[in-house]
Amino acid sequence: MWPQPYLPPHPMMLEESRQNKLAAAKKKLKEYQQRKSPGIPAGAKTKKKKTDSSPETTTSGGGHSPGDSQYQELAVALESSSVTISQLNENIESLKQQKKQVEHQLEEAKKTNNEIHKAQMERLETINILTLEKADLKTTLYHTKRAARHFEEESKDLAGRLQYSLQRIQELERALCAVSTQQQEEDRSSSCREAVLHRRLQQTIKERALLNAHVTQVTESLKQVQLERDEYAKHIKGERARWQERMWKMSVEARTLKEEKKRDIHRIQELERSLSELKNQMAKPPSLAPPAVTSVVEQLQDEAKHLRQEVEGLEGKLQSQVENNQALSLLSKEQKQRLQEQEEMLREQEVQRVREQERLCEQNERLREQQKTLQEQGERLRKQEQRLRKQEERLRKEEERLQKQEKRLWDQEERLWKKEERLQKQEERLALSQNHKLDKQLAEPQCSFEDLNNEKKSALQLEQQVKELQEKLDEEHLEAASQQNQQLETQLSLVALPGEGDGGQHLDSEEEEAPRPTPNIPEDLESREATSSFMDLPKEKADGTEQVERRELGFVQPSGVTDGMRESFTVYESQGAVPNTRHQEMEDVIRLAQKEEEMKVKLLELQELVLPLVGNHEGHGKFLIAAQNPADEPTPGAPAPQELGAAGEQDDFYEVSLDNNVEPAPGAAREGSPHDNPTVQQIVQLSPVMQDT
């Protein structure tokens, strides 16, 4: 929390102390008048002759006694004092109202300071949220880099395993390298990555279509080969059936030939037996009919020859048939071997086709897996791009909100500057009017008007001091808000897209103070200590104003150029150092206010020392002479009371009026001039000097 500014004492306490001091001054004045009244009837006449040359003051020719004239003067003085007391009460009431207004303004200033402090706490919370979001962004960037490295490793593995798709894998590596190296340019690289992935997907789809076409072509060729194989097998089966039928026929013919051969051999054997019988019969003596026998023998021999010829023919046929059978068996063996070889070739072709089909299926599986991995990578990249876009949108919204807030602060600052200018113009007009009134009132001899003007001056100066403190606090808060906005903009420029410039500039809240005229030093001060204190106090006031200006410059000047690459804890330390410096500056301001209060206490003590001077008879003549000089013929070196009043009104520090606690002289209302009473002359002469101190 901000330290509360040191407030002056309560106005009711000041009023009570003033009333008490006023009553004590009245008592002392009455006692002084009672002591001086019985023994100075003639002295009063001489003093009246010295101070004024009016015919009313001479009592030599009058019919009244000196005691009666003194009593009349006391009555007139009491009446004038009652009138001035009533006027002072009215002035006190008006000052009370003004003080209440000032207190109300102070409460409003406190409320505005609390609101500004709440706004600063909200800004600190937003800074914390932004730092947390920055840490989340760093973690996401780290994970994306790790994912990119993982993708590179996977792409290298795929490049080692998939020689057939080397070119596409190299494109994938380039795409992954582009993802890892160009993450700060998501808007441009996202479209490029999508185009590359789309192109690669199109390429894989085309290759898959080509492979599917190749597979269909191979399957069609395989089906055609299978059909050819089936036709060839049918043809071989038909030829085999024909050869088997032919072999069966040849075997049947061979069997019939063997049977015929057996029959022929059996007939030949029978003929040989019959021939042997005939030979035996021929060897016997011829019978009675030899011609018949010879004819029979000849016939049998002819038949035997014929049978031998037939047997030889059958043997040749059988031999040729055997040779044909051997040739057919060789042909059948050769055909069987050729068929076996063709079947082996067909089996090998089938195995090769099956292997090729398996290889194509494996390649299709690898392509499907690769396409699946590419789709997964594309999905991950899309999700990552969506997250980054959401984060960018959130950062843009936060930046827009900060810009709007900064714009509101600028508008508020402009309104404050305009309000301050209006207040300065009003203060200048009030100062001119007050100076004009003071000139008129100083021309008049009544002390009540001087008291009223001094009270108004003190109230105006109090209001001016409160306004200055309020303006300083507003400038502090605005400067701190501007510095925090600049730090936020530097952090956002590091996180957001490159190319954005720094958002804010330092607020220049230095006030150009109006030149303050130094009060004129009166030459009629006889005490060296009074003159030295009178000369030192303006220097102290100037030193105080210089300190306040240095504090204001310390609030305005930046603590240093913050580095955008610092870690978040250094940012918190730099942000925490600003409130500490503000606390120190506020403590210095409070210390200055305490010093001013001590000066006011010293002025009150000097006010208490004024009244004992009234009883000093030796200093009475000096103060009387000092009162006559500014009223009748002012010295050229001594300043007029108007100048002193105007100079006291333009000072920035608190001033306490000393004329409110002194009762006016009894003859002031009657005569209309301060020359009739020496007490009035003393207080009138000392009041501007004490106001300057």
Swiss-Prot record:
Keyword set includes Coiled coil: yes
GO cellular component: cis-Golgi network; Golgi cis cisterna; Golgi cisterna membrane
GO biological process: one example: Golgi organization
Pfam families per record: GOLGA2L5
Keyword match Membrane: no
Bias-annotated ranges (Basic and acidic residues): 537-551
Coiled coil: 77-611
Region: Disordered, residue numbers: 1-72, 497-551, 629-650, 660-679
Domain of life: Eukaryota
Pro residues bias spans: 1-11
Entry keywords, A to Z: Coiled coil
InterPro entries for the chain: GOLGA_cons_dom, Golgin_A
Family recorded in the similarity comment: Belongs to the GOLGA6 family.
PANTHER family documented for this protein: GOLGIN SUBFAMILY A MEMBER 6A-RELATED (PTHR10881:SF44), GOLGIN SUBFAMILY A MEMBER-RELATED (PTHR10881)
Protein name in the entry: Golgin subfamily A member 6B
Species this protein is from: Homo sapiens
Lineage per the UniProt record: Eukaryota, Metazoa, Chordata, Craniata, Vertebrata
Gene name tied to this protein: GOLGA6B
